[in-house]
């Protein structure tokens, strides 16, 4: 059985590895074989993955629809996570007003073909709506039985503190991986102290830590990585990209010493932080699934972590611990 982890001080428990479905959007990650990705959903459940993460903005709507169909009769076997808070077809881009959150949640339920959502997240902070209003809407959805838990995504410590005055988020979902360690400064310690689960997205560095890229890799039109920016970090700008690839090659050699892949090293590194409830990975097919699942039982030693940091230092690759969070 795969390792199970609790979300902070709540009763929400899931597999340590989660199935991320941004790639299922069919619009933001280049071509994807929808049938193969759908088949991977059932295979993931068989492999012990119990958490599936999506959002209405992925596509928009495609990811929720594909996941809902793929889960089928196995819905009760999983922890289903989705997100609202974007006006995907208009401006302003973010909307966490009470009216919007309630209405969009109904749409999520329909697309996912379910009567309840295990964890509903506010996708990005809405700087124009009081958090008290948003939290009130989430509390009402919970009371109505339409969601079991609620949380936030991409929120700072100050934002979480304000939310805590009006309820208790079960989780904060933010990017965290070897090339982006911004959350180590404040957010991860806060979540650990306050009993809030932490969901790490981008565990594989949006592909940088898979070993699949080369200096000649280009991203097709419509793939968000083609813009160079990754949540306010220049990870996919050519100069940085080439440095990161050199770093990944050395990490690959380090992982091979333990008979592992660089992707497994990346997953094990994220899961090694005590605040992390679940590490999300995008899974396109069953072969990727098998590789990722095999990483969960690997516990990195202090020596392993020191070797990783030494590689970053020698290659001159920043980890952005002190950089500002994207909000």
Model region roles, listed by residue range:
Residues 7, 19, 37, 52, ...:
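Conserved, mostly hydrophobic/aromatic
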Residues 29-36, 62, 66, 93-103, ...:
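Alpha-helix N-cap and loop-to-helix initiation/capping positions
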């Amino acid at each position: 059985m795969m390792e199970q982890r609790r979300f902070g001080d709540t009763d929400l428990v899931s597999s340590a590895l989660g199935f991320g479905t941004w790639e299922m959007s069919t619009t933001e990650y280049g071509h994807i074989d929808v049938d193969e990705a759908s088949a991977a959903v059932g295979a993931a459940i068989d492999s012990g993955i119990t958490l599936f993460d999506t959002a209405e903005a992925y596509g928009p709507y495609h990811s929720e629809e594909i996941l809902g169909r793929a889960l089928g009769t196995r819905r009760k076997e999983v922890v289903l996570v989705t997100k609202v808070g974007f006006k995907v077809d208009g401006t302003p881009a973010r909307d966490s007003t009470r009216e919007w959150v309630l209405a969009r949640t109904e749409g999520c339920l329909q697309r996912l073909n379910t009567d309840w959502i295990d964890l509903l997240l506010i996708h990005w902070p809405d700087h124009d709506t009081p958090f008290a209003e948003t939290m009130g809407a989430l509390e009402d959805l919970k009371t109505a039985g339409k969601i079991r838990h609620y949380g936030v995504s991409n929120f700072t410590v100050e934002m979480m503190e304000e939310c805590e005055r009006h309820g208790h988020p079960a989780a904060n979902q933010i990017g965290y991986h070897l090339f982006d360690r911004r959350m180590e400064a404040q957010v991860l310690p806060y979540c650990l102290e306050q009993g809030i689960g932490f969901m790490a997205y981008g565990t594989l560095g949006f592909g940088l830590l898979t070993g699949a890229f080369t200096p000649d890799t280009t991203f097709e039109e419509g793939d968000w990585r083609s813009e160079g920016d990754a949540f306010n970090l220049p990870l996919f700008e050519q100069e940085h990209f080439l440095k990161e690839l050199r770093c990944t090659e050395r990490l690959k050699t380090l992982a091979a010493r333990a008979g592992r892949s660089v992707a497994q090293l990346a997953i094990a590194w994220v899961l090694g932080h005590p605040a992390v409830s679940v590490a999300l990975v995008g899974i396109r097919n069953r072969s990727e699934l098998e590789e990722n699942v095999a990483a969960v039982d690997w516990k990195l030693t202090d020596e392993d972590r020191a070797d990783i940091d030494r590689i970053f230092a020698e290659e001159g690759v920043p980890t952005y611990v002190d950089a500002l969070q994207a909000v």
